[in-house]
């Protein structure tokens, strides 16, 4: 049985004071939720503060990116080892905004994923196609390239530290959402692909999240699909009430 995971990506929003207020407001709204893993991803500067505020409440903290070296002369970078030290249990790697604006490639995603696993973090490995790619019927080709690239040379034993997040780029921040059936089709493809690479039991155990304009209004339909195991939430995670509404998808 795969435990659902709901992750909130706060992106480049929330000062230290705002982040503290948000986690303080969120915790009481979700503290009684059982059998759902809850993760929030604040900006780097708020990670330690949010981790301390979350404490033993069950809400976990992720970073939005990391570097692939543990330490060294890499000005401006943050290693998975330091993220773990700051209170992170998870890290988002390969988000479409990193790929689009910062030159992230499948190769760097793979290096970062290996480094994060080495540090003991759980990776939220993001994949997804653009609108142009979907319209030219390249969705599955793009997804396969990204999944194979991200998982290259990662042994099956380490898959327990990887969660795949499918985020159709055309649905991020646009208000457009893939239909439940569209999302399920890609999730099923990803699971089949993981089965081809590693085997059916590994594929069956892997959690695959959907990301792309997830809201309290559409989470129930998405979560009713057999291969959708949770959500990577953007805008709706910036308000405690809406994020809690997503976390509480079971009612």
From Swiss-Prot:
Report residues binding substrate: 9-11, 173, 213, 234-235
Broad EC category: isomerase
Keyword Cytoplasm appears in the UniProt entry: yes
Which Gene Ontology molecular function entries are recorded, alphabetically?
triose-phosphate isomerase activity
Pathway listed for it is:
Carbohydrate biosynthesis; gluconeogenesis; Carbohydrate degradation; glycolysis; D-glyceraldehyde 3-phosphate from glycerone phosphate: step 1/1
Question: What Pfam families does UniProt report for this protein, alphabetically?
Answer: TIM
Subcellular localization(s) per the UniProt record: Cytoplasm
Self-association state and partner proteins as the record states: Homodimer.
Q: InterPro entries attached here?
A: Aldolase_TIM (IPR013785), TIM_sf (IPR035990), TrioseP_Isoase_bac/euk (IPR022896), Triosephosphate_isomerase (IPR000652), Triosephosphate_isomerase_AS (IPR020861)
Question: What is this enzyme's catalytic activity, as reactions?
Answer: D-glyceraldehyde 3-phosphate = dihydroxyacetone phosphate
BP GO annotations: gluconeogenesis; glyceraldehyde-3-phosphate biosynthetic process; glycerol catabolic process; glycolytic process
Listed name of the protein:
Triosephosphate isomerase
User: Which residues are named in the active-site annotation?
Assistant: 95, 167
Bilayer-crossing regions: none
Check the record and name the PANTHER family matching this protein.
Answer: TRIOSEPHOSPHATE ISOMERASE (PTHR21139:SF42)
Described by its record, this protein's role is as follows:
Involved in the gluconeogenesis. Catalyzes stereospecifically the conversion of dihydroxyacetone phosphate (DHAP) to D-glyceraldehyde-3-phosphate (G3P).
Q: Which gene encodes it?
A: tpiA
Organism, by scientific name, is: Trichlorobacter lovleyi (strain ATCC BAA-1151 / DSM 17278 / SZ)
Instruction: State its Enzyme Commission number(s).
Output: 5.3.1.1
Family, as annotated: Belongs to the triosephosphate isomerase family.
Q: Name one GO cellular component term.
A: cytosol
UniProt keywords (A-Z) are: Cytoplasm, Gluconeogenesis, Glycolysis, Isomerase
